Amino acid sequence: MRILVLAFLWAGTCLGQFPEDAVILETSEKGETLLLAGKERELDVPREPASTFKTVIAWAALDRGLVKDIEAPLPGAEGDNLRLALQKSLNPPFDLLAVELGGEVLGGYAGRSGLIQGEIPKRWMEGKEKEARHGADLMTTIRREHQVAVAWMMGRPPWDGPAGQKLQEALLWKGAEKPIRAKTGTYGGSVWVTGYGPEKAVTVWLPGGLPRRPEALKIFFGRWEIPVPNP
């Protein structure tokens, strides 16, 4: 992924558009990637994927037939379907799915997804079943998170199969004014919003915790000049 840094940051931090501690990547449908905020050295620092890992759990569950209908109520989600469980980042349904899939199977999907940095230990989930929702001890980087979002946008393998296509529909934020597919994550000192919509893929990373989630969402949806939708 070739990164173009905005020399004068005319679209970024010098005008106060983005927080000083934000890292923001944006890639056009033509494949041009801009670093709108932050330093390039931040892109490859290992970080916890937080709840962005739930996309891997959802993909594996769809591919294995554990979830057949993304609009049907999902066990453990108190009546919500897979789409809303992803959007609200509910924990219980993904805990159940992770246990049903098992560490070896889920680790295989994690490796194929491109999200996780380094080799995935065979017993990565052993004794950490309730931490699988955020990848347990597995690590990602801002660059990898964004590359996955770009792969979603471009329909590149492994996301071009039936399960990958269903996942893309499950990631749709139906309340948004434009067709945006995204996933949030907040854990381990990272706040993520990553996904894609018309003409671009965007990844927003902020340091911190849950209180900064609304801020990250505002930046993300602001790249399409629309408000943050309600679930």
Predicted regions and their residues:
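Sec-dependent N-terminal signal peptides
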Residues: 3-12
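Second-shell loop/turn segments in exported
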Residues: 40-48, 72-84, 91-100, 129-137, ...
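Short, well-structured active-site flanking segments
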Residues: 53, 62-79, 158-164
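Sec/Tat-exported extracytoplasmic proteins
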Residues: 56-66, 86-90, 97-105, 109-119, ...
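A short, well-structured edge-of-sheet supersecondary motif
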Residues: 15-41, 193-197, 203-204
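Active-site SXXK
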Residues: 46-69, 85, 145, 202
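Structured C-terminal helix/loop/strand segments within mature extracytoplasmic catalytic/sensor domains
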Residues: 42, 99-105, 148, 153-231
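Mid-domain, small-residue-enriched loop/turn segments at the edges of structured enzyme/sensor domains
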Residues: 77, 81-82, 96-149
